[in-house]
From Swiss-Prot:
This is Probable arginine--tRNA ligase, cytoplasmic. CDD domains: Anticodon_Ia_Arg, ArgRS_core. It catalyses: tRNA(Arg) + L-arginine + ATP = L-arginyl-tRNA(Arg) + AMP + diphosphate. Belongs to the class-I aminoacyl-tRNA synthetase family. The lineage of its organism: Eukaryota, Fungi, Dikarya, Ascomycota, Taphrinomycotina. It comes from Schizosaccharomyces pombe (strain 972 / ATCC 24843) (Fission yeast).
């Protein structure tokens, strides 16, 4: 088995072909299909005289089984003559050794020769292993990706779950394309709710519970004090109405909400005691969040938050807005009338009447600070589509302030999750969601007593498969679409689900375990022994993986990779009854192990990119 793309290029030369031309878009060392793109561009240019730089980008890919490996719409080359006739003429003149070329209307369809494709693709995968599909196109570029971003003392709701899954994938994807990525969790850790929380903790707080599970306990405290505040407000309104009915003056008492606002104002003014209480709640919550994210194979380079923008920086941003004549005053509040620049954007408030800031002000300061720190080429905010208007306003403000990096900011939005609840009630915390998924998966596994008895660590396997189920259900459709959270469907081994993906990987692992060959022996396999059409179909799919990642990167879509992985697993499943390994002669075994091993590697790479832990046994 050849072991490098250089050797493949040399083998093309020995067939009487010229060395492959160099294209800016081509990356033959990381993407084997680019070898064919380069070869086709070179050969077609000899036939029709069109410059190769025009032919190469006109070659279109498709992962549909019924489509050609590459298609070329003849009109894109702008050659005089009827496109149908040109397509037919060029197809007849094209060399027949490595590529089968047919004319289909105005299209040229290129199908790669199965044996040559197999000799190209499989050695590359075995050589590059976990690096197969990765490239260096983003080398030297920096991306800051802000995702998850829950609010302290509030539930980790479905929107945060989607942001976590999509954001972690985008971070992994950017790294796979050579980018330097900074993962940021921008916490909702500032605001009046902390005043309410501090008041509530004095009444309902428990130190042991706070240390054991700070996020859950602070949420419980917040719910209770909020209920107190609501009850108090209702009483104040009732007392006021009663006094007014009797013609008596009424002076409302200082409410819990009033006290909360005062507490937050002290925080903004730098009061040490108030900040000490807040900092303790924040630090304990972050410690717990880190444990939760670790369980999902997610890490952050920075835990940022609204609190981390200094008052000095926010004042600087407001002063800058004033100097640009963008600030207007309305009843003591400061706002920007963006409708003057875009009617759809309306007005955006940057400072309340009492002088306290809003998250818009803090987001402006945060973005400014972030660029000064990272000098990013791209800053991604992974936030639901409900915030589309907000980010349009924010980015417009960046533009009006003259920030050169304004166009480098991107809002990656997503739809809603509907009906996310457990069979025992509402699952409002990420830990709850994962625990229920684990329990549900464990129940499914226990239904097959024979297989369950063979699993060495069923609790750990159930946990991994449960987390896979959550991620895959969220990632199957386009991110902008809403989807219904379905526990039964999600935890099924039937259909295109997370559990099925894990099963497919573990089954591929078992193929290798059933025979005793070294990697070196498999890499020396005679690939000419792979002659079955279904084997060539699988090789074609394996060769498409680098392009799949490029498309996922282009559209920032998790579903692009997930859809591909299911196509891959279906193609592999079809081969189990055709390409037996056990009981076959040695050379046949090695060739088939080379194919199944490459399939496992690509499946593993894709699953890892999605943030999953591929299982060897289950």
């Amino acid at each position: 088995m050849a072991t490098s793309v250089d050797q493949i290029s040399k083998s093309l030369s020995t067939l009487g072909l010229q060395d492959l031309p160099v294209f800016r878009e081509a990356d033959i060392h990381h993407n084997p299909v680019d070898v064919y793109r380069s070869y086709i561009s070179s050969e077609l240019s000899k036939i029709n005289g069109v410059d190769v730089s025009l032919i190469y980008p006109a070659l279109e890919t498709s992962i549909s089984k019924d489509s050609a490996d590459l298609n070329l719409p003849v009109p894109r080359l702008r050659v005089k003559g009827k496109p149908q006739e040109l397509a037919q003429k060029w197809a007849e003149a094209f060399p027949k050794d490595l590529v089968e070329v047919t004319a289909n209307g105005i299209f040229l369809r290129f199908n790669f020769n199965g044996p040559s494709l197999t000799k190209l693709i499989l050695p590359i995968i075995w050589e590059q292993r976990e690096n197969y599909g990765r490239n260096e196109s983003g080398s030297g570029k920096v991306a800051v990706i802000e995702f998850s971003s829950p609010n302290i003392a509030k539930p980790f709701h479905a929107g945060h779950l989607r942001s976590t899954i999509i954001g972690s994938f985008l971070a992994n994807l950017h790294e796979s394309q050579g980018w330097k990525v900074h993962r940021v969790n921008y916490l909702g850790d500032w605001g009046k709710q902390f005043g309410l929380l501090a008041i509530g903790y004095k009444k309902y707080g428990d130190e042991d519970q706070l240390k054991s599970n700070p996020i859950r306990h602070l949420y419980d405290v917040y719910v209770k004090v909020n209920a107190d505040a609501t009850e108090e407000d209702e009483k104040i309104q009732k007392d006021k109405a009663e006094a007014e009915s009797k013609g008596l003056p009424y002076t409302p008492p200082l409410s819990l909400h009033d006290k909360a606002r005062e507490f937050f104002k002290r925080m903004e003014d730098g009061d040490e005691e108030s900040l000490k209480v807040w900092a303790r709640f924040r630090d304990l919550s972050i410690t717990k969040l880190k444990d939760t994210y670790d369980r999902l194979n997610i890490h952050y380079d920075e835990y940022d938050g609204e609190s981390q923008v200094s008052l000095e920086l926010m004042n600087k941003m407001v002063d800058e807005l004033r100097s640009l004549n963008l600030i207007e005053e309305d009843g003591g509040a400061l706002l920007i009338d963006l409708s003057k620049h875009d009617k759809k954007l309306g007005k955006a408030i940057v400072q309340k009447r009492d002088g306290t800031t809003l998250y818009l002000t803090r987001d402006i300061g945060t973005a400014y600070k972030r660029y000064e720190k990272y000098k990013f080429d791209k800053s991604i905010y992974v936030v639901s589509s409900q915030q589309d208007m907000y980010f349009s306003q924010l980015f417009k403000i960046f533009e009006l302030m003259g920030f050169d990096w304004a166009k480098k900011c991107v809002h990656i939005n997503y739809g809603l999750v509907q009906g996310m609840s457990t069979r025992k009630g509402k699952a409002v915390f990420l830990d709850d969601i994962m625990e229920v998924a684990k329990e549900e998966m464990h129940k499914v596994m226990q239904k097959n007593e024979e297989k369950y008895a063979q699993v060495e660590n069923p609790e750990e396997v159930a946990d991994i498969v449960g987390k896979t189920a959550i991620r895959i259900q969220d990632s199957t459709g386009k991110r902008i679409n809403n989807y219904a959270f379905d526990w039964s469907r999600m935890t099924s081994f039937e259909g295109d689900t997370g559990p099925y993906l894990q099963y497919a990987h573990s089954r591929l692992s078992s193929v290798r375990r059933n025979v005793n060959y070294t990697d070196e022996e498999i890499m020396g396999a005679n690939l000419e022994l792979l002659t079955e059409p279904d084997a060539y179909d699988l090789v074609r799919l394996l060769g498409q993986y680098p392009d799949v990642l490029k498309n996922a990167f282009r559209f920032q879509e998790t579903s692009t990779v997930v859809t591909y992985l299911f196509k891959l697993t279906h193609a592999v499943s079809k081969l189990y009854d055709i390409l037996w390994v056990r009981g076959r002669e040695r050379d046949i075994q090695l060739a088939r192990l080379a194919l199944f091993g490459a399939a496992k590697q690509v499946l593993n790479n894709g699953m890892t990119l999605l943030g999953l832990t591929p299982l060897e046994r289950m």
